[in-house]
Amino acid sequence: MRDVRVAIDHNATNNQLLFDKDTDTLTVDEIIRSKIIDAARIVEMSAPTRLLESSYNLEDSVFWEGQGRGYVVLPDDFMRLIAFRMSDWERTVFTTIEAGSVEYAKQSSRYKGIRGNPQKPVCAVINRPIGKVLEFYACKNEDAEVTQASYRPYPQIDPNDGIDISEQCYMATIYLTASLVLHTFGEKDLAITLSELAKSFYQI
């Protein structure tokens, strides 16, 4: 809460009285609290993978579907893949493709060379009746095992009013939270300024 207030105060001009005597401190803190989750989600979904921490691991139980294809079930709090690799792959996958994309359609091709393979693997986050799964394409055979599988969860405030944010995304989240709060108070110009400042921390 304090860091968001500091960000607003440091960027306000002398003529801007953002939190006057009629603005209850508790009300302001509640607004900050309500915006910080959205800000953290936006920042960590937009930031390059190299800025994100990978302290959350996926289950390594694999469900095979033939032709070296398979999937792992994703947890309910899954927001974004950080890294995934099978034991016979030559590279790690850091980004996923979408279900409606041309690349995803290629994974159903009858021609093996068009689909993902150990030299150029592909992963997709897909909704199934059992929930979200991470489909992977493909392995040489079903003897392969998961060797790396990490993700970022949807941010949430814990019972101690803490929130887990990747260290290198912290300042961007603070400034974007401040921007969202300022929009609530009708300070659109300063809100835009702080939003752009937030982007400067992760669009590098």
Name the predicted role of every residue range:
Residues 1-204:
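Glycine-enriched, solvent-exposed interface loops adjoining structured elements
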